[in-house]
Amino acid sequence: MPLNHYQQEVGPSLADASPGKMPDVALLEGRYCSVEHLTVAEHYKDILDFYFTNQILSDWTYMYADPFESEEAVRQCLEDYEQSQNPYFFAIRAKASGKVLGTFSLMAITPKNRSVEMGRVILAPTLQKTRAATEAQYLLMKYVFEDLNYRRYEWKCDSLNRPSANAAMRLGFTYEGRFRNHAIYKGRSRDTDWFSIIESEWPALKKRFENWLAPENFDEKGQQRRSLRDY
């Protein structure tokens, strides 16, 4: 650990301390899905199905927002999402069906510290636990580390939201700890669990994703031959 002229330990100097970029992308193309900057004109009809018409009410338990009560409320929400720069919202289009089956965002975007959070994840049941869902996360991670030049990628969730925590760890996030009494929402107290991936971990994690997503990792029934954690 380096020392300053007072003989105090300090963090390592950075070869590049410039700020990261703000997200500004229309399309990230993958083998199983595309990740598209969310717009009302392109995505409202498909999103309406899993946000309202056939929404799963239990999916909103750990979200700060409540379930939508009308089509107009969904439209207004998506209009806000389209205009927002922080968070910056994306739609996930599954190539198998051609339909948008999920949304997520880059949020808590902090260019000065080159830190950003993955959040606001809402997936239709038909997208959950699929290659397309995993690839969408991979595509956005790649964009964050390789195009935006960020150092830290965060994931946070209610400490009681085990599916979210399990998803984070499967995707390669490291558990960092728990912020107790971190928030109040829906009249409840929330402890928040924090996870992260840092830039030095990305090259190895990228290889894991690419190996797992390769067509030869899946049999004729679409079942994985090796899990993501096995790579």
Q: What spans do the regions from the language model cover?
A:
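GNAT-family acyltransferases
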Residues: M1-T130, Y143, R188-D193, I197-Y231
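Glycine-rich acyl-CoA binding loop
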Residues: A133
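Conserved beta-strand-loop-alpha-helix junction that forms the acyl-donor binding cleft
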Residues: W155-S164
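Conserved active-site tyrosine of GNAT-family acetyltransferases
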Residues: A167-A168, F195
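Conserved catalytic-core motifs of GNAT/GCN5-like acyltransferases
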Residues: T174-R188
